[in-house]
Amino acid sequence: LWDEDLRSEILLVDSAREVIGVGLNSLGYSLNDTDTDHLQEAYAKLCELTPNVKAIVGDEIKMLLANEEAAVGVVWSGDAAIIMDENDKLDYSIPSEGSMVWFDNIVIPATARNIEGAHLFINFMLDPENSAQNTEYVGYATPNAAALEYLPEEITGDERFYPGPDVTDNLEVLANLGKRMLGYYNELFLEFKMHRKRA
């Protein structure tokens, strides 16, 4: 990302944990680091990236990348699958330094009024055939092992989305760092965005 050939060619997703995480991972630190010295190092490293950042954007990142309005984007894997469906010249890779692993959760709130309906919906979504269909639609890999047999090999064999342990061993789940530390991440991200405007 810091390659001078990428000047004004990178799109970043508008999310503090993801962007600060890029800085942390590039330095060999955990995405869940709470050491303020490490976080300041990550901020400084991101400031060095400023000349290469074209924009920090939200959901429009998919359209911008598909239209080749930037050479590189830091995106979630499901968005990458959608982007690559729209433009087969684009590719997706997971940084060797590491990245995050995430998953959606289906929960039933304590205040839910239709518990039976909620269970029916969850069971419907977890049905292997339905789960496979959902995976093909959203582009995100499925953790539902029973659904894998309903997916084509071109999906399950794609190591960009179903990587082996050599890649997954460098992935981390984002931990809840608490309000104070989350506030610190958000402050650093805001400082980074302001630094870009001044640069």
Go through each PLM region and give its residues:
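Extracytoplasmic ligand-binding site segments that recognize negatively charged/polar headgroups
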Residues: 1-69
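A ligand-binding cleft/hinge motif common to bilobed small-molecule-binding domains
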Residues: 66-67, 71-89
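Mature extracytoplasmic/periplasmic domains
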Residues: 100, 109-169
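Periplasmic-binding protein-like
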Residues: 39-48, 86-112, 156
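Short, hydrophobic alpha-helical packing/hinge segments within bilobed ligand-binding/sensory domains
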Residues: 61-64, 80, 118, 131
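Solvent-exposed loop/turn segments at secondary-structure junctions
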Residues: 8, 16-19, 78-81, 97-100, ...
